[in-house]
Amino acid sequence: MARKDQISHRGPLSGNNRSHALNATKRKFNLNLQQITLKTASGKKIRLKVSAKTKKTLRKWGHV
């Protein structure tokens, strides 16, 4: 499975590492993916990989 949030569909970002001499080398900023379990309206459990930011938003709105 790709490193994507299954709810918000956000993926990794790209940027640069910067050394002390300010040399730039490409790097990837991965999401902080975590596995959560949600209950559907019918009571069925589903497991999703979501970012920590999405998990925090779901918790705020009472879905987790």
Curated annotation (Swiss-Prot):
Q: Does the keyword Ribonucleoprotein apply?
A: yes
Region Disordered: list its residue ranges: 1-23
What Pfam families does the annotation carry? Ribosomal_L28
Which InterPro entries does its entry note? Bacterial_rp_bL28, Ribosomal_bL28, Ribosomal_bL28/bL31-like_sf, Ribosomal_bL28_bact-type, Ribosomal_bL28_sf
Any one GO MF annotation of this record: structural constituent of ribosome
UniProtKB keywords: Ribonucleoprotein, Ribosomal protein
Superkingdom: Bacteria
The processes (GO biological process) annotated in the record are: translation
Q: Which GO terms describe its cellular component?
A: ribonucleoprotein complex; ribosome
Concerning its family, UniProt says:
Belongs to the bacterial ribosomal protein bL28 family.
Write down what this protein is called. Answer: Large ribosomal subunit protein bL28
Which organism's genome codes for this protein?
Mesomycoplasma hyopneumoniae (strain J / ATCC 25934 / NCTC 10110)
The organism's taxonomic lineage, starting at the top? Bacteria, Bacillati, Mycoplasmatota, Mycoplasmoidales, Metamycoplasmataceae
Q: Which gene encodes it?
A: rpmB
